[in-house]
Amino acid sequence: VFEHVDPFIGTEATALPEPSGLAATWWWPKPQVGNTHPGATYPLGMVSACAYSGAYPTGYGRYDLSTEGLPPELHTTQRASGFTHFQQSGTGAIRKYYNYVRVTPMLQPLDDLGRLWEITDEQAEPGWYSATLDSGIRCEITVGPKTAVHRYTFPAHRDARLVVDLSMGGLDIPYGRTVPLRAHLHALEPGVAQGEITVEGAPLAVHVECDHPHWRQMLWYDRRLMPGGTRLDFDRIRPTTLRPFGLMWAGPTEPGQVVELRFGFSLRGVEQARANLVAECGPGPSSFAERRARTAHTWRQTLGKVQVDTPSADRQTVLSTALYHSLIKPCLAPDESPFWPTDTPFAFDIATMWDIYRTQLPLLTALLPERAVELATALLHIGEEEGNLPIGYRMARGADRFSRQGSALAHTFLADLCRLGLPGMDWDWALVHLHNDLRRTYGEEFLLRGVAHPISHTLDLAYGYHCTAVLAQQVGDRALLDQFAPLAGRWRNAFDPETGLLHDSTFYEGGRWNYSFRLLHDMAARIELAGGDAAFVGLLDRFFGVGADPVKQPGLAPTEDEMREGYALHRFEGLNNEPDMEAPWAYQYAGRPDRTADVVHAIVQN
């Protein structure tokens, strides 16, 4: 599988033929653009690194902020102002966009920092990314779980330089920049420096080493060098007072001269960042080749858990690449929580549970059960320390946790692990937090009134009680089992028996048709409520556009009327949004697996 992965798939707007057949009747509001990047990654690792252009939403690529219609361009070609660390992958408007610690290889004065160079050549494979800039400098990057190693090949020049910018963060979109709250940077000795920035409430520490013994090392501030300076400290930074700052190595180069930079990262201070670097990359000073080989080996082992047999080279590549993308996030960072002092599993970029709880997480559990247990344990620690099981969780601090999207979504993941009997879980401890979480946010309204609005949360909470009952049974708590059974049955309160659909309500990125075909824990009763198999299939056929005319997709900067007309179709979105991802499989429960096959084949072919 490794050889068939193409990390560039999913980094551009889709290039697909005009939809035909059943797929031509579907309508989707979201832009058909892949929100991924081709940068260096490690399976479920903490660190990634890639070329930075400021584009939405990863920092890589050519596109501007887009939530509807066709994606507008930010750049006409692939460009980069340098190479940054920590990227989102597969998300949309996630609001925390990272792209910290930018490295810019330059032959120009420091005043040119921030300009965009054309990328004249790019290559990538799992764990490795390479780009050549029109300045003639080639960059290669590889990463470990908590580290990154850069290798730069320079042309001949009297004063080449590598500029590390610690003030950098976010995207080049409206309100997309991330400004550090505080920062410090310390040049320890020739070729070695450490620093820490507090960004989005998280303290990100870095230890960096340069393997060139004779290059000058200098701190800089506001694009001015600080000869002889060894330390920079900043506090209470705001956008109007921020000036770029960082460090630089500079010196003459011969044609083809190679210089390496090694980075260790940590959320627990500079000494742990240094320890991470030594543990993953050795004592140095050079470690690119070995780190790349080790990361490639790990990717081969991980991807090798799946075998793809197909005569189609295109489908082999698409499936292999999709598998690769499914194993980049969440980021597992053991013993790295900056928010509590104990050494525990820790995870971030759970972005979001709404996207992954019934899609990626079951796949992760099947392929890497021990990592699924690690993630589940991290979720429970987050719940214990922060008061709720997250819907979304990033390398950040704050209450912006996507609670409108759904409720009690971690419960499905935990119940799966419990049913499978995977070792390493404390189910008594898990039951405490699952039960407590059911009463938070919309949970109180659900308990008091039997229904919660938005109405989709009624389905979430009823299913959450069903899942938590699995844990109660595992630990033998009969009292909780008796409490949960009637609460799990309250999913019925969400539906209008006159229409067989959900009651009118507000909905997150969808309408009642999108949410009405969620897979529930009692599908027989759900189908009966809709009037039986035939009536339920009729509703599904209406939703999937069986026999309907082709529709027109929204264009560039669509008008409100254009979007309103599309939403009024109440049509399937082609697996392009979360609310109706499960819907094709609802046919199975009404005795029409052929219809499921029709929809799935239409998705694959279009």
Regions found by a protein language model. Name each.
Residues 464:
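ATP-dependent phospho-/nucleotidyl transfer catalytic cores
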Residues 1-458, 472-493, 499-514, 518-594, ...:
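Accessory carbohydrate-recognition regions in carbohydrate-active enzymes
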